[in-house]
């Protein structure tokens, strides 16, 4: 599934419900308590004003202030809320590979959401009359253009505000608010609303309810007529009585069902929640879809979990939270030394349970081998560093010191197989079968054990900087030689001819990327794959103007870097 863009959305939802069932709970009484308090205390004239604001095609700072003021009042009344709780996951909270996977997914989710919001909110389409909007839609259909993001009539709702950060966390439905609005504004009893929403929630246990399902339920639950038939879009408040808001409310008031909506995050269970989520993700082949648009179930869960380390990710008020998920949850791969316990002190919780804190990392013997290799490097002399594949999911790293004719070269198995295959096809040519036996943790240990404040030379430093920072190595200094591609690869063929035998992991076929412009000639395919080690040698050759005369020596033996292949007897 990681290679496919198709998402079996409901299957993923069911798998996440099953995998995270231990974190779900029954919250019906708490939701109804908040709903009754909101229904009795809120000025619904103010609610109606905010709902009118959200129907406008262009909203201003004054409109945003009305929404924020009402959100503050609702937040004050609710017991179910998320509070500002920033979390930094470190080694020990999660395994190193889990930390890198989390950091990578948050970075990709950030890119996707920012592209989605840019596409959806920054283009104001004007105030054409309805007749011209209809005519424009007809012209677009005639020309073969599919309807783009936005509303069916072509109007894009935008926020024209000075400080867009004030929009953060002011949206999203809350079941207590949905129930209160349906009760008061629909002129219904709360019991009728609860019964109707429960029917939607029960349907949600077997499928995603749609507008056709809603129409079939209305004869038995007339209060559902208040639900809008318009499609949801980004930056639409919880005061809009959408089908999604109603389904969420129905899911949260079920007695059971292991619904994700009932998860509560706390400092005590946050790391376990993330660990279990990543396990389900790998088992089901879930991924961050890089296409702008709605979030898939994994993306939605990850965003909500990481927004705050304390609260209700799906159903609580979150208007007091500052920042986005990638701001409030981060990763630090710096390895902290274990504190020496005082004599007679009680064992740590993990030790009481018989757990080995090193299981996800290298053994002490393996760590000593890496330390010995690093100690051979001379920080006062030039050291080249290069990586291959994504900066938060690298598959290859090399350190090369020309003066001492030595190098450190290691690999790791990627988490993002789809991204890896793309990189293999267009850049490094590494095949999964050639690195699937790489010993996990070596690459992170190499970075973590580099001497403090060491100066490293690179060709292109952005990706390397991000990788070092995520490992907590902001102390390491980078010098970027900033060659053009032609300058950097001047000695490419000679390096591969003379030193190509040093690395046997680049066996794929490199395919040139297609240019977006039809008029542009296709970009030339590199003659050779990108190898972190050979690229370091090649970059140094370009600087010095000649090839190294002697073959460099590996500081980490190959048998240390890979698990032995299983032998089968016939």
From Swiss-Prot:
Q: Which residues bind Mg(2+)?
A: 386, 388, 535
Localization terms from the record: Virion; Host cytoplasm
Q: Which GO terms describe its biological process?
A: negative stranded viral RNA replication; RNA-templated viral transcription; symbiont-mediated suppression of host cytoplasmic pattern recognition receptor signaling pathway via inhibition of IKBKE activity
Pfam families in the cross-refs: Arena_ncap_C (PF17290), Arena_nucleocap (PF00843)
Establish whether keyword Manganese is in the entry: yes
- Principal location listed in the UniProt entry: virion
Region annotated Disordered sits at: 332-356
Q: Which residues bind Mn(2+)?
A: 386, 388, 535
What residues does the record give for site: Important for exonuclease activity?
A: 463
Spell out the residue ranges making up region: Binding site for the cap structure m7GTP: 54-236
In short, the EC number is: 3.1.13.-
Q: Which residues bind Zn(2+)?
A: 396, 503, 506, 531
Q: Name one GO cellular component term.
A: viral nucleocapsid
- Keywords assigned by UniProt? Capsid protein, Helical capsid protein, Host cytoplasm, Host-virus interaction, Hydrolase, Inhibition of host IKBKE by virus, Inhibition of host innate immune response by virus, Inhibition of host RLR pathway by virus, Interferon antiviral system evasion, Manganese, Metal-binding, Ribonucleoprotein, RNA-binding, Viral immunoevasion, Viral nucleoprotein, Virion, Zinc
Matching InterPro entries: Nucleocapsid_arenaviridae, Nucleocapsid_C_arenaviridae, Nucleocapsid_C_sf, Nucleocapsid_N_arenaviridae
Q: What class of enzyme is it?
A: hydrolase
- One GO molecular function term? hydrolase activity
- Recorded family membership: Belongs to the arenaviridae nucleocapsid protein family.
Assembly and oligomerization = Homomultimerizes to form the nucleocapsid. Binds to viral genomic RNA. Interacts with glycoprotein G2. Interacts with protein Z; this interaction probably directs the encapsidated genome to budding sites. Interacts with protein L; this interaction does not interfere with Z-L interaction. Interacts with host IKBKE (via Protein kinase domain); the interaction inhibits IKBKE kinase activity.
The domain section of the record reads: The N-terminal region is important for the cap-binding activity while the C-terminal region contains the 3'-5' exoribonuclease activity. A CCHE zinc binding site is present in the C-terminal region and may thus contribute to the substrate binding and/or the specificity of the exonuclease activity.
Function, as annotated? Encapsidates the genome, protecting it from nucleases. The encapsidated genomic RNA is termed the nucleocapsid (NC). Serves as template for viral transcription and replication. The increased presence of protein N in host cell does not seem to trigger the switch from transcription to replication as observed in other negative strain RNA viruses.
Q: What is this protein called?
A: Nucleoprotein
- Origin species, per record, is Tacaribe virus (strain Franze-Fernandez)
């Amino acid at each position: 599934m990681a290679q496919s863009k198709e998402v079996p959305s409901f299957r993923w939802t069911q798998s996440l419900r099953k995998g995270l069932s231990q974190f779900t709970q029954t919250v019906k009484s708490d939701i109804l308590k908040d709903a009754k308090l909101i229904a009795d205390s809120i000025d619904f004239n103010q609610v109606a004003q905010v709902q009118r604001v959200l129907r406008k095609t262009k909203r201003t700072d004054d409109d945003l202030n009305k929404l924020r003021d009402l959100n503050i009042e609702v937040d004050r009344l609710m017991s179910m809320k998320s509070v500002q709780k920033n979390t930094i996951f470190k080694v020990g909270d999660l395994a190193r590979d889990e930390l890198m996977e989390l950091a990578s997914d948050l970075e990709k989710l950030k890119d996707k959401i920012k592209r989605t919001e840019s596409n959806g909110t920054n283009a104001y389409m004007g105030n054409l009359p309805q007749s011209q909007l209809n005519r424009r839609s007809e012209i677009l259909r005639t020309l073969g253009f599919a309807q783009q993001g936005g509303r069916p009539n072509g109007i894009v709702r935008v926020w024209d505000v000075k400080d867009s950060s004030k929009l953060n966390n002011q949206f999203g439905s809350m079941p207590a608010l949905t129930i209160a609005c349906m009760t008061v504004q629909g002129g219904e009893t709360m019991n009728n609303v609860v019964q109707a929403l429960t029917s939607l929630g029960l349907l949600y246990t077997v499928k995603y309810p749609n507008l056709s399902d809603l129409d079939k339920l209305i004869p038995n639950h007339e209060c559902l007529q208040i639900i809008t038939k318009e499609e949801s879009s980004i930056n639409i408040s919880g005061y809009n009585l959408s089908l999604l808001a109603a389904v969420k409310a129905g899911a949260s008031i079920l007695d059971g069902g292991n619904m994700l909506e009932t998860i509560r995050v706390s400092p005590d269970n946050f790391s376990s929640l993330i660990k279990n989520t990543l396990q389900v993700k790998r088992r089901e082949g879930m991924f961050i879809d890089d296409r702008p648009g709605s979030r898939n179930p994994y993306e939605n869960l990850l965003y909500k979990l990481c927004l705050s380390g304390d609260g209700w990710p799906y159903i609580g008020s979150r208007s007091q939270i500052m920042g986005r998920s990638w701001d409030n949850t981060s990763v630090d791969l710096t390895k902290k030394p274990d504190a020496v316990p005082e004599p007679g002190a009680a064992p740590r919780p993990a030790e009481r349970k018989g757990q080995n804190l090193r299981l996800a990392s290298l053994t002490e013997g393996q760590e000593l081998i890496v330390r010995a290799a690093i100690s051979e490097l001379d920080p006062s002399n030039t050291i080249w560093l290069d990586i291959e594949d994504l900066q938060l999911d690298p598959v290859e790293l090399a350190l090369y010191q020309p003066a001492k004719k030595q190098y450190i070269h290691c690999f790791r198995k990627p988490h993002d197989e789809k991204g890896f295959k793309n990189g293999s096809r267009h850049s490094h040519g590494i095949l999964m079968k050639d690195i699937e036996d790489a010993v996990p943790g070596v690459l992170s240990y190499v970075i973590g054990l580099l001497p403090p404040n060491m100066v490293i030379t690179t060709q292109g430093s952005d990706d390397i900087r991000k990788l070092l920072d995520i490992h907590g190595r902001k102390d390491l200094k980078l010098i970027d030689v900033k060659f053009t591609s032609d300058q950097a690869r001047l000695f490419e063929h000679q390096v591969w001819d003379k030193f190509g035998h040093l690395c046997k992991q680049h066996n794929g076929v490199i395919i040139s990327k297609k240019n977006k412009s039809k008029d542009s000639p296709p970009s030339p395919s590199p003659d050779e794959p990108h190898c972190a080690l050979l690229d370091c040698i090649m970059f140094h050759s370009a600087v010095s103007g000649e090839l190294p005369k002697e073959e460099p020596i590996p500081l980490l033996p190959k048998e240390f870097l890979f698990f032995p292949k299983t032998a089968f007897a016939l």
